[in-house]
Amino acid sequence: YLDVKQLANYLLCIGNGQVFNGRKTCQIGCRAVCQQPGCSGYKECEQIPNIRLHKYRCHCNEA
C-alpha cells in the first residue's frame, strides 16, 4: 500500500519500480535511472520472489 507521497514519488521518478534482469544489471541501471529528474538517487534493488527469473526491481530514494 502506497501513501500519496510515495505514489507521487513513483509517478515523478521514472526509475522507481523498473525491473531488470540480474542483480548487477539492476544496480548499474537503477543507479543511472535514479539520477533522473524527479528521483533522489539510488536506494536498492529488490529481488522479485521468483527463484528462476532473477529479476530485480529498482527503488530510488524518496524525494
From Swiss-Prot:
GO biological process, one term: defense response to bacterium
Sorted UniProt keywords: Antibiotic, Antimicrobial, Disulfide bond, Fungicide, Immunity, Innate immunity, Secreted
Triggers of expression: By bacterial infection.
Location of this chain's protein in the cell: Secreted
Entry GO terms, CC: extracellular region
A Pfam family this chain is assigned to: Megourin
PTM info: Contains four disulfide bonds.
Main location: secreted
Biological role stated in the UniProt entry: Has antimicrobial activity against Gram-positive bacteria and fungi.
Subunit (UniProt): Monomer.
Identification of the protein by name: Megourin-1
